[in-house]
C-alpha cells in the first residue's frame, strides 16, 4: 500500500483528494494536516467522509510526513517549496496542487505569484503533471507540479492542432468559465451566495497567472512561439469548467481530417473523450469525475476552428489529475481509483 499524506486538507481540493483516495485500492491515508483544526476528526468537518476516513487533522510537526511514500500539497502557493526539500531528502515523493513547481521560468513565477522561489534548483527535476502530454516524465519524477485548472483545458484543447502545425500559434484565444469552487474555500465577499449567485463576470482579462503557465508548456511541447489571449470568467455554479478556444487554420483541412487529428491524439487516453464533430459538451457531463470532453466546430466552414472543452475543475482540473500522476509515479494503472461515473443531475 502507498502511504499518503495530505498537507492542507481543509480546502476543496483537499477534501476532493480525500474523497478519491478513501476508495483507492492501493492507498493507505496516514496523515492530513491543518494547524487550525489540529485534533479535529476529518469526518466532523466533512460528514460526507463518515465511515470512510477515520483520521483526525494534525499539525504539520506532529504528522510524521517523512514516513509517507508520497505527500500531496493542497495548500496556498509557497507552502510546498518550503517543505519539499526535507521530504525529498527522506525519500518521499511530492505532488503540489499549487503553482510552486509548474513554471520553469522563475522570473515568471515571481512576477505572477509575488514571492521569490525558495528552491529553484528543484525546478529542473520537477515534472509538469499533465499526464496526457507528459506521461514519461511523470513516471520517473520525485516531484510533480500539478497543472492549473484552466491550463489543463487550454493545453488539451490546443495541443493536437499545434503539434500538427495547422493553426496560427501566434494568435490563440481562450474564453473560459469556471464554477466558484475554483476560487477556493476561503471566506471572500465576492464568493458569497448573494454576490456570485445570479451573476456572471470576467476577471483577470488584462493578465492572469494561468496564461504564462499555458504558454510555457505549449512552447515546450511544440517548439513554437505561442501567443495567447486568455479571458477567464466566474459563473454561478459550484463546480465545472467550460473553455472555448479559437484558432485560425493555416493549412487546408476538411472537418473529417480535423476530427481524426483529435481522435488519433487521444485514442488511448482513458480520461479524454473526443465527442463527434459539432457536439456541445456540458459541464454536468463531467461532474465529480476525472473525465475531460472535447468537441470541435468550424463556423461557416471558414478558417476558424473552435474547440470546446469541459471538465470538473476540482477533479481533472485538480485532485483527480494529481491522483492520476501518483498512480504513474508508483507504477499503477493510471485509472486506479479514478473510474468514477459523472454525477447527474
From Swiss-Prot:
What EC numbers are recorded for this enzyme?
1.2.1.38
Recorded hits in Pfam families, A to Z, give: Semialdhyde_dh (PF01118), Semialdhyde_dhC_1 (PF22698)
Pathway(s) it belongs to: Amino-acid biosynthesis; L-arginine biosynthesis; N(2)-acetyl-L-ornithine from L-glutamate: step 3/4
Q: InterPro entries, alphabetically?
A: AGPR_AS (IPR023013), AGPR_type-1 (IPR000706), NAD(P)-bd_dom_sf (IPR036291), NAGSA_dehydrogenase (IPR050085), Semialdehyde_DH_NAD-bd (IPR000534)
Recorded hits in SMART domains, A to Z, give: Semialdhyde_dh (SM00859)
PANTHER family for this protein: N-ACETYL-GAMMA-GLUTAMYL-PHOSPHATE REDUCTASE, CHLOROPLASTIC-RELATED, N-ACETYL-GAMMA-GLUTAMYL-PHOSPHATE REDUCTASE, CHLOROPLASTIC-RELATED-RELATED
Protein name listed in UniProt: N-acetyl-gamma-glutamyl-phosphate reductase
